[in-house]
């Protein structure tokens, strides 16, 4: 019975992986190459570790499930972008435009959100803010708070 359950679980996992849209290879290459204005790009599931999109326009981009560990994202426009399940640990989102962005399930350990307005972000939780850090200029939705970066 256990073997049957494992086979069923593997089949469901394979189906889910097949259904998930893969990142656009050309868009990922643009990010890695430093050509970073990428409005509406499909970067879902991409490895974007240690890349930099500082002060560029990526509004409406799909970062769902991407690994953006240590990514330099400060001052960039991510309005309307999706970061569902994205690894943002160590990323620098200082002063980024996240108006209407979706951070549902994003991991934000030691993520800098200094000076960032998060009041219109979707899916933001206190647990995410507890793992991140900001400053006096960081704006969070009512009832939430963020620690100051040291």
Where does each model-flagged region fall?
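Sec-dependent signal peptide recognition
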Residues: 1-7
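N-terminal signal peptide c-region/cleavage motif recognized by signal peptidases
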Residues: 13-17
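Tandem repeat scaffolds
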Residues: 18-150
């Amino acid at each position: 019975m256990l073997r049957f359950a494992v086979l069923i679980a593997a089949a469901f996992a394979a189906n889910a992986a097949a259904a998930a849209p893969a990142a656009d290879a050309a868009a990922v290459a643009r990010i890695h190459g430093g050509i970073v204005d990428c409005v509406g790009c499909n970067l879902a599931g991409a490895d974007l570790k240690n890349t930099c999109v500082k002060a560029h326009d990526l509004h409406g981009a799909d970062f769902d499930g991407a690994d953006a560990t240590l990514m330099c994202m400060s001052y960039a426009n991510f309005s309307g972008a999706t970061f569902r399940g994205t690894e943002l640990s160590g990323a620098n989102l200082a002063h980024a435009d996240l108006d209407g962005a979706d951070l549902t399930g994003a991991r934000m350990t030691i993520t800098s959100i200094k000076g960032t307005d998060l009041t219109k972000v979707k899916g933001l939780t206190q647990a995410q803010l507890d793992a991140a850090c900001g400053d006096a200029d960081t704006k969070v939705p009512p009832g939430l708070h963020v620690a100051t970066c040291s």
